[in-house]
């Protein structure tokens, strides 16, 4: 009746269709049967058979339902009790436990004519679900088949095989059992909390991989496994396949340190998540829905149901009153977290408050317009940068008539963003400072404002603005960009910024670029990773620099706030940073351990994987890195010169999980209030009137530093000496 192959695959020898298909010499790749991972090999009819062939001879009827013993609970997939459903559990295309997902039949391109059986009728195209190999869509073919059949057209054959191979690979990565024909690759991670968030949906437009022709029978299992191996190796060689080893700003066209005022790059769009319904409602719950998002010139947000559609289902026009909220990291599902941001509409109203002293204030009224999210950190940062740069390019709006304020006010917010690269020796080799000046005005009438900075060119032309400190040199403005309300011709002549501000609207007045002349950062970061066989240990040390400890500008010690240090983790190491239980998987987390301070003689009873002396550290799948968070430095409970350290130790399964071409960089982000990295100062601010409004100037500096991690490779017995590369060998 049947015979078993050495690979535990069962084939029916008495099936006439199977015997006849083996005798055919022209049995091509497009017409072969596909091996199913449930232990059965189904032999399927060819599309080139003549129409006179009876349908009963092309398949084997099933007298009883085929039970899938691995995907329980639920009735058999081909029984009347099984109802195919399609749901969105958090990630597109990933079904919930106990459900079966039916995927639609891809449409053929209009340029290629599909071929059918006998040349008549629609093409017979069926796709295999990811997690349920027995469920398939019914065909609209004229001949009724008792069992589902699978075929490929001549034009879409290679793409179809590639789709099948990728679905089989996904099935391999996330199943609870193994198969002797599946090869365990180091880059495959069986932990869904990171792999599902980083996996991209398959697109039929992906590039095809050339496969060498071998003297193998095309309907044999070895041929199928050979093709899957080639497809898998092509994916691992894709430079965009493993994002865990890439920096958010790494690439050929984008550098970590910006070389211009505008850092956004032309993009066709991003795959985002939209919070629906858009506004909170007491009668309904909100959920995430997948969309494809585009940002057009002029501040137009276009949202599509999926990539490739011609017309968007929604358009949103940004106006000068719109702004982006602070980015947050929120729980998405069991598969990890999501980066979220809100598009808000902000308006201001004047109110009188009665406290111990009566005062008039201008309070903002915030209305949420959209809430967007993304599981890809790099796409999320690109979207934020693009929207911020589109807002400064919007035209100015006219002020409403007959609107007056009881209390006039001008507020300036100066923010410096420092971008720099630091070598493993601690030297700052590349840096740039981009300064953004935001303005908020409440003025009566069409008043014209003026602003004078400590510009070096202004110091040469008019020294009256530098009478108090004539020996202090001004800053060199390398490049600048103004809002549309600024009179650019006046600035070229007098180096004084004159503008007619927007009424009750916070807008970016100008941005300019300067060089970082301080020469020393507020604190230094030193990172070392040691590899010895399959044992990996990373150590990071943080200490305040002498310049930050003795700041001459303020009596109190300036502090660095909201410090985040990201240490990238290769995909092969993720499984060592997760713990499992019956309910879920969770990341290993380390909080402040006083006994792990430098110079301490006490050792903990059980040594954890991650240790820190201040703050907290854990693996964040949203960043694909170990994130060390510190609220404030210097710490309140330690002296300013006290160094702090982080250490995490991993015992990998094999030394093959350590990539030899891994050159990691740690990313450091923090902010300082009442600080200035560009040395920008306001020399004069006011309006062309005798009655001057109240003036408020706030300054802060945001630092983004990329630090090179030193690699030390300790060679063990039997290890290839060439694997260490340029690392230090002890």
Swiss-Prot record:
UniProt-listed InterPro entries: Adaptor_comp_med_subunit, AP2_Mu_C_sf, MHD, SHD_dom, Stonin
Stretches assigned to coiled coil: none
Cross-referenced Pfam families: Adap_comp_sub (PF00928)
GO MF annotation terms: cargo adaptor activity
Segments forming domain SHD: 269-402
Keywords, in A-Z order: Cytoplasm, Endocytosis, Membrane
Name of the featured protein: Stonin-1
Organism of derivation: Mus musculus
Higher taxonomy: Eukaryota, Metazoa, Chordata, Craniata, Vertebrata
Gene: Ston1
